[in-house]
Structure formats: structure tokens, C-alpha cells
């Protein structure tokens, strides 16, 4: 038996099983606390489909299909894919459209054939808006995509607490509402989604995106207010807005149910001046005891610069991440 886990440890754990199983769900699964993990860090690498945003196209209207994306990732030696909802045929930015079961299951079967996991999925939403009807619509959209995630076998769905309206902020779209009031809107909506996710075995991950959630404290406060064992943090390494973004990652890491690993820590515009120190990042991940997928995502600047070629850049970044994983093992 593994030297780090003795027979005595096993028997102690087994003795507690009847007690744990008899507890109410709220006691057995502590809400709003750091994720309880056992064993050492176990890390696998996934590819977020957003890396191929232009090629996939919103609603799957680009020249690259999700199946072809999965095949590329298998050839590149990823462990999994993270097929963002935007790129499925049937996706609607503000509507309730979802892909057909036939399409979902074809992608799932192909990933199985390729030995790829499906590490998660995600959609866009705006819970900071003062428009209550729009927020309610987004709750229903997330519920629809929770069902999609369950059919895919994706354990996590990413949602946002930040506004996704370009050139806007949470202050502007909330019409000047107080932060505590906006946090309550967000928490109530995500809690409803998490309760729905519990019925399908899908965890809701709240991703920091540099607006309402600028720091780990912002993220943790919201997760605690949501207070659900079916909700945790998606730690986006490129979207904290603080003086020490690595410190923010370290603080949020114990709450992580998934990650988004970017090439820079201060946004795509500052990648050259603030590239991600992958060794430092992996030490943070390992120190937290995280076990699971590290989805990577490459971004191209909007505007004048030439877009990155994901066919070239994604495998290069994957190799760098794998080297950092090996170097910190």
C-alpha cells in the first residue's frame, strides 16, 4: 500500500463512512468552505475552446467543428477539452437555445474514442444588470446549459459575476446600485443555479473576470454568500486586478473547482510585460492540494495586432504548462 496512506488510515476512514452517510447533505458537504481534498495534487491539462474562438465561431458557424477541435486536442496530447457553450450549434447569446442531444452525444462519444475527458463548459451571463427580467432569463439559460453539461459528462459549468457587456462596468449596468445589493442579486441567482446543478451533478464555478470580482476576497465573499456545496471558484489566472495577482490566486486556490490558465496575469494586452510565471503558478496550485484539470486558454488582442494562430500557439503553451507541472512535482 502507498506509504503516504497506510492501512490504519484506510480503516479510520472506513469507520467514519456510516456516520458521514447518515448526515444531512448540508452537513456532509460543507457549503462555502475551501474544497476538502485527500491525496496529493493530481493535475491534468485541458484545452478551453475559446482558444479557437475565430475558427469555431459563435453557434458553431466557423470552419472548425467541435469534433475536429477535439481531434486536434487529442493529437496535441491534451487530457481533456473544455467545449465552451458559445461554439455549439444551437447556442443563443440571450436565448434559451441549446444543441440537440444527437450533437451532444456525438461529441461525447468522439471524446471517449479519443481518450479525452470533458473538463467543463460555460456560457456568458450578466447578473450585475439592474434589468431583473434579463437576470431571470440568464438563470434559465444557465439551467438549460447545466442539463447540457450533465449530458456531456462535464462536471463544472462556468458562470460570471462580472458584466460581460463591453465598455460597461457593474456600476453602470446596475444603474448605480450599491455593491452589497448587486452582490445579493448575483448570489441569489447563482444559488438558484447551483441548486439546479445539484439535481444533475453539475457544479457551478464562478469565474473572476476583472469587474465585480477583481480580487480573491471579492470572489470568496460571493461564494460564501451563495453558500452552496455545488458552487466554487474558477480561478482565472489572467483576470485579477490587484497589485499581487499571484497572491490573489493563492488565496482563491483552496476554493477552486476549476482553473483558467492564461499566458499573462494582467490581461492579454499586457502579456509581454506580465507573462505568467508558470513555475510560480504551479507551486500555488500544488500548495492548495488541487486535484483536477488545468484548462489552458490563449487570447488574441482585440484591435490592431495580428491574432495568434492557435494551431501553433496552443501546443507550445501546453508544452510549457506540462514542463512546469513536471518541474514542480
Regions found by a protein language model. Give the residues of each.
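Glycine-rich, proline-tolerant flexible connector loops at the mouths of alpha/beta enzymes
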Residues: 82-106, 164-167
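Active-site acidic/histidine proton-transfer and metal-coordination neighborhood
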Residues: 14-24, 31-37, 71, 104-120, ...
Amino acid at each position: 500500500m502507498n506509504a503516504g496512506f497506510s492501512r490504519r488510515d484506510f480503516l479510520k476512514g472506513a469507520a467514519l463512512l456510516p456516520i458521514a452517510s447518515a448526515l444531512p447533505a448540508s452537513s456532509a458537504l460543507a457549503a462555502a468552505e475551501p474544497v476538502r481534498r485527500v491525496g496529493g495534487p493530481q493535475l491534468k491539462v485541458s484545452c478551453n475552446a475559446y482558444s479557437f474562438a475565430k475558427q469555431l465561431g459563435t453557434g458553431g458557424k466557423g470552419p472548425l467543428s467541435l469534433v475536429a477541435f477535439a481531434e486536434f486536442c487529442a493529437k496535441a496530447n491534451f487530457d481533456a477539452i473544455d467545449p465552451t457553450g458559445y461554439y455549439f450549434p444551437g447556442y443563443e447569446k440571450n436565448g434559451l437555445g441549446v444543441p440537440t442531444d444527437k450533437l451532444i452525444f456525438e461529441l461525447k462519444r468522439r471524446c471517449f474514442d479519443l481518450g479525452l475527458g470533458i473538463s467543463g463548459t460555460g456560457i456568458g451571463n450578466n447578473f450585475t444588470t439592474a434589468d431583473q427580467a434579463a437576470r431571470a432569463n440568464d438563470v434559465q439559460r444557465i439551467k438549460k446549459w447545466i442539463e447540457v453539461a450533465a449530458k456531456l459528462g462535464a462536471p463544472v459549468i462556468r458562470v460570471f459575476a462580472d458584466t460581460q457587456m463591453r465598455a460597461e462596468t457593474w456600476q453602470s449596468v446596475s444603474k448605480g446600485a450599491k455593491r452589497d445589493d448587486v452582490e445579493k442579486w448575483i448570489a441569489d441567482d447563482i444559488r438558484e443555479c447551483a441548486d439546479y446543478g445539484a439535481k444533475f451533478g453539475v457544479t457551478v464555478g464562478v469565474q473572476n473576470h476583472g469587474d465585480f470580482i477583481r480580487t480573491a476576497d471579492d470572489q470568496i465573499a460571493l461564494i460564501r454568500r451563495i453558500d452552496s456545496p455545488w458552487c466554487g471558484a474558477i480561478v482565472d489566472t489572467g483576470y485579477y486586478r490587484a497589485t499581487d495577482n499571484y497572491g490573489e490566486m493563492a488565496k482563491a486556490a483552496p476554493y477552486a473547482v476549476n482553473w483558467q490558465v492564461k499566458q499573462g496575469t494582467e490581461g492579454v494586452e499586457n502579456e509581454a510585460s506580465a507573462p505568467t510565471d508558470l513555475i510560480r503558478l504551479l507551486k500555488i496550485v500544488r500548495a492548495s492540494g488541487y486535484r483536477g484539470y488545468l484548462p489552458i486558454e490563449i487570447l488574441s488582442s482585440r484591435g490592431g495586432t495580428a491574432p495568434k494562430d492557435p494551431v501553433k500557439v496552443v501546443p507550445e503553451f501546453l508544452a510549457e504548462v506540462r514542463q512546469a507541472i513536471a518541474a514542480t512535482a
